[in-house]
């Protein structure tokens, strides 16, 4: 099956849509031609599928990698920048990314920190679950799903709060953490167009405390809402014509999870892993990642808001206040 689902040209913003909205499909890629060649916002995933996705998409628009001069990365995750290795085989563009994701773009091992893998391993060890994730390798996990990560040669910090001119588009850089510490969205005010990255789409992106957590995610949605965008193009999925409604839906889904946890605690005290299993009643790997990070993000907010508390002890249970 082709990794490309379709294409769209929005007044010079050329979109390459991935075959599906769910990971490990690559992110949508945005291409903006100009008199010097072209710029890209995100480049897609590593692995052979990611390579085909990128090259086939550019071929559709009659473009070649050698003419790429600028890459803006919404964040340093493998489905958004894994294909940078294929780019660097042909050309060495200027690469812009938020300062908080620069380290991960240059040395992907830092993703184990922002994905909160150590947190997940700690909670898993305390819980005594039979599945052993003590040797979990995040990058093998990426490779196994065909969504490999790769490193940039050099990057520049993108000017948060300022504008970046890409062809005929003037994008305001909006810092929108939650899913990644340096996640950005790009807003063209004249067109009312918001490139929302992973934060708005069919469902919420995963989130961990180190990436901004639930608190950061909700604040990012507030920031997006204040822009009063008309149209959103997410990193995963198709064009969204009612931007405000899409943002409200994601916020509602996030808060529904919080309410679900609160109601679970009304039935009695529960451990961290019991709450994680309530949120994600699927396979153990989802309990481990991203389940632990998501659960921790909710509990941090709920403790801050004074609606739950944790009992004493290493494996203390959570209770409602």
Predicted regions and their residues:
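C-terminal regulatory/interaction regions
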Residues: 260-321
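Metallo-beta-lactamase
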Residues: 38, 45-48, 136-149, 165, ...
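Conserved beta-strand hairpin/beta-sheet module of binuclear metal-dependent hydrolase folds
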Residues: 4-61, 67, 93, 110, ...
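Histidine-centered divalent metal-coordination motifs
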Residues: 74-80, 98, 179, 183, ...
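Short, leucine-enriched amphipathic alpha-helices that occur as contiguous helical runs
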Residues: 42, 93, 254, 258-262, ...
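Aromatic/hydrophobic pocket-lining residues that form the small-molecule binding cavity
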Residues: 54, 217, 221, 295
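Short Gly/Pro-enriched turn/cap motifs at secondary-structure boundaries
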Residues: 5, 20-21, 146-148, 153-155, ...
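Active-site HxH/HxHxD metal-binding segment of metal-dependent hydrolases
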Residues: 25, 45-52, 57-164
